[in-house]
């Protein structure tokens, strides 16, 4: 085994300095990005999110539901821990159960939100989890319109896409900055 005890060359020293400088700059950018993340105002507020959703499994069983989710805001999003739903029209899909809670809505920017790991679990099978990105409108405090596509991964839903589409409005209104 041979060890090279020669001191580093000027080129090696320069490359080491360059690498350290780049690493420091990347670290600063990461800190700056975290500091400028979207925030919700006001935080610590109980809210409801209400709207009409159309759901189906692989284009079948289309059911229209009126849903209300109940949650609490924090600086970075909303955590929903309860919901109710009523069938407005259509097929046999249940409107009042199946959504796996808690459900987290993350504020991405002043015009976009993400539902984190959305999952629907029913007696016929499970769809999800999947992150669902939706447009956000500060003027109306509304997520959507948009469509969640969740992969079926169990029971009769295995290998099929489950869909939920519509808009949901937060009340009292919040702002994402």
Tell me the role of every PLM-derived stretch.
Residues 13-14, 31-39:
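Sec/Tat signal peptide C-region and signal peptidase I cleavage site
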Residues 44-50, 110-116, 145-147:
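Short, hydrophobic/aromatic-rich segments at coil-to-beta transitions
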């Amino acid at each position: 085994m041979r060890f090279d005890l020669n001191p580093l060359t000027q080129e090696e020293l320069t490359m080491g300095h360059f690498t350290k400088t780049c690493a420091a700059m990347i670290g600063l950018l990461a800190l700056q990005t975290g500091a400028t993340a979207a925030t919700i105002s006001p935080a610590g507020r109980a809210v409801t999110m209400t709207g009409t959703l159309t759901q189906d499994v692989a284009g079948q069983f289309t059911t229209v539901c009126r849903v209300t989710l109940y949650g609490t805001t924090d600086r970075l999003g909303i955590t929903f821990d309860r919901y109710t739903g009523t069938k407005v029209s259509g097929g046999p899909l249940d409107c009042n159960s199946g959504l796996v809670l808690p459900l987290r809505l993350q504020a991405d920017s002043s015009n976009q939100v993400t539902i984190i790991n959305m999952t629907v679990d029913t007696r016929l099978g499970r769809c999800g989890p999947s992150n669902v990105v939706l447009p956000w409108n500060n003027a109306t405090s509304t997520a959507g319109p948009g469509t969640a596509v969740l992969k079926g991964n169990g029971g009769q839903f295995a290998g099929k896409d489950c869909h939920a589409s519509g808009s949901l409005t937060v009340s009292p209104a919040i702002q994402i900055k």
